Structures are given as C-alpha cells and as structure tokens.
Amino acid sequence: MLSPRRTKFRKQQRGRMEGLATRGSTLNFGDFALQAQEPAWITSRQIEASRRAMTRYIRRGGQIWIRIFPDKPVTMRPAETRMGSGKGNPEFWVAVVKPGRILFEIGGVSEEIAREAMRLASFKLPIKTKFIVRSQPQEQE
C-alpha cells in the first residue's frame, strides 16, 4: 500500500475540496487514462485494489502509471471514547482528488484492453470516472 516515508507533521486538518483540479488533469505518460468526475478522498487501499485489477487484466503487456499519491493522514478516535482528550491517531492515508484529475494512465495496449482495464479499476473507486484517449498517438523514441 502507498504511504509517505516520512512527513513534517503527523496529523493534518481535513480541509475542503472545492473547484476543479488545476494540476494533473492532462495525459502525460500513456495513451489512455481514467479521469475523476467527482471530488473525493481515495484511500491507499482503493488505489492498490484498482492497480491490481488493471494489472491482472492487461497481464504482461502494457504499462500502468498511478498519477495520484495518498499523502494526507486521516485520524480516527477509538470506539466509545468520550469527547475531548485531543485528536485521534492516524489510521490510513488518502489522496485528495478533485474533478478533472487523472488517476491512472495505461500505455502499450489496444484501446479495447485499456477501456476494460479502466472499467474494472473504476469499480474499486468511490467516484464517477471517465475514460480518456490521447488525441494523437505518442511517438516512441
């Protein structure tokens, strides 16, 4: 599962997810991509489940790029704890995703295979997604 090696601070405030993604909203590596249509926190477990679904489907051909990283710690209090006594301990890591953000990219496979792999990956995610195709194929150097 993905998580930062070390962070400056152990705990973060929750923040807000307003507006569209300004960075990470264009295809950079592969020929096909999965783009977020809704704002959400995507956990490292969901990212890993999506990655496994895609790699199992495309098998040995092609390459997958994960364009999001879970860098936000989410804290939780123990069950049946009284109010007060500070903030809970970090339990898991999430990636903050805004609409328009590219989540995954695939290259080196046909469009049908990429579309099906992305469809399987989207079932593991808590948001609506969109399949994107590069307008002109990328030249291999």
Curated annotation (Swiss-Prot):
Taxonomic superkingdom: Bacteria
Entries under PROSITE patterns matching the protein: RIBOSOMAL_L16_1, RIBOSOMAL_L16_2
Pfam family, one: Ribosomal_L16
Listed InterPro entries: Ribosomal_uL16, Ribosomal_uL16_bact-type, Ribosomal_uL16_CS, Ribosomal_uL16_dom, Ribosomal_uL16_sf
Keyword Lipid metabolism among record annotations: no
GO molecular function, one term: tRNA binding
Family: Belongs to the universal ribosomal protein uL16 family.
Keywords: Ribonucleoprotein, Ribosomal protein, RNA-binding, rRNA-binding, tRNA-binding
Functional summary from the UniProt entry: Binds 23S rRNA and is also seen to make contacts with the A and possibly P site tRNAs.
Name of the featured protein: Large ribosomal subunit protein uL16
GO cellular component: cytosolic large ribosomal subunit
Gene label: rplP
Any one biological process term the GO annotation gives: translation
HAMAP family: Ribosomal_uL16
Subunit structure: Part of the 50S ribosomal subunit.
